[in-house]
Amino acid sequence: MPEITVRAKSKTYPVYINEFALDDVRGKWTESLAKYSHVFVLTDGHVAELHKSKLDEILTDLPVVTYYVAPNGEEAKTFRVYEDVMTKMIESGLDRKAVLIAFGGGVIGDLGGFVASTYMRGIPFYQVPTTVLAHDSAVGGKVAINHPLGKNMIGNFYQPEAVIYDTQFFATLPEREMRSGFAEMIKHALISDYTLLRALMDTFTEPKDFYTKDLTPFLQRGIEIKANIVAQDETEQGVRAYLNFGHTFGHALEAYGNFSKWLHGEAITYGMIYALTMSETIYGLDFNLAEFKTWLRNLGYDTTFDVTVPFSNILENMRHDKKTTFNEISMVLLKEIGKPVIFKAEDELIFETYKRVMRNGEDAF
């Protein structure tokens, strides 16, 4: 089974990835879990309905297991749900020798990691992601909840004990969720390797390919790219910011849509094309953007806006981005594919780029 080692400054841990990862690690994982006083599983309603029985089968011999089922989607990453999870943990008698399992997509991983990092000043946790999107968020230790004014504004850096990534769960993902997660795979290729991007474009040409082609080697490569960056810069003081390519504009768009209008990967896709457009302006990026947009459309990504998104809202949300310092908005741009750079963008440039990609319902991207 493919195994990747993440060597962050604070912790070294494995990422297990294949179609039957849970079965493959079951013996040694349950042996490790048995050492804890209490196992607390955080999941959401959708995952619980489809896959709880699989986890039950593995945890059946453990003496104390408690589940908390959070709301589906970004609604789970709120103060209200965070407090409710904490209340459940306290009422269930979890002590500092307890362990948390985040069983779900990126939202559950973010929430679960933040809960684990703050409960009694920190308890261990495991990431058991169930979505394509979570191949990015489950690795690297960035955990957070949202604030109404910005995404992931309240958070921490807190590494898991391990990531157990069982790709059999993908079979139940809706196409829209698959596409959302695939956007992060595209991001990893854009910031690291044109050859990887070309392989993605040649392998995945229509939506059904998400289910019929093998995602695992591409997911593994994306995780390796991220693990290498995290090893250099765990707390995002430098190169780790490159992983935010497309996220400055994308997060601003998510906030404008109240974290419900667009899925994360959908917003990030718009954000990546916004950043590619700005990269053409600033660095003369040599990249066939027209071919790239056509490929996205063939995969089912929406490349038009049917609503007017006010620039004032986007700009204000971009100012709340975590990379913004001294009121200067930092963008991750590309000098060329695989060569990202941090660029401090002035409002005029942000607006000019905005006008190029947001044409009030025309083919914005």
From Swiss-Prot:
Enzyme class: lyase
Cellular compartment(s): Cytoplasm
Record's keyword terms, sorted: Amino-acid biosynthesis, Aromatic amino acid biosynthesis, Cobalt, Cytoplasm, Lyase, Metal-binding, NAD, Nucleotide-binding, Zinc
Gene3D superfamilies reported in the protein's UniProt record: 3.40.50.1970, Dehydroquinate synthase-like - alpha domain
SUPFAM superfamilies associated with the record: Dehydroquinate synthase-like (SSF56796)
Catalyses which reaction(s): 7-phospho-2-dehydro-3-deoxy-D-arabino-heptonate = 3-dehydroquinate + phosphate
Family recorded in the similarity comment: Belongs to the sugar phosphate cyclases superfamily. Dehydroquinate synthase family.
Protein name: 3-dehydroquinate synthase
Gene encoding the protein: aroB
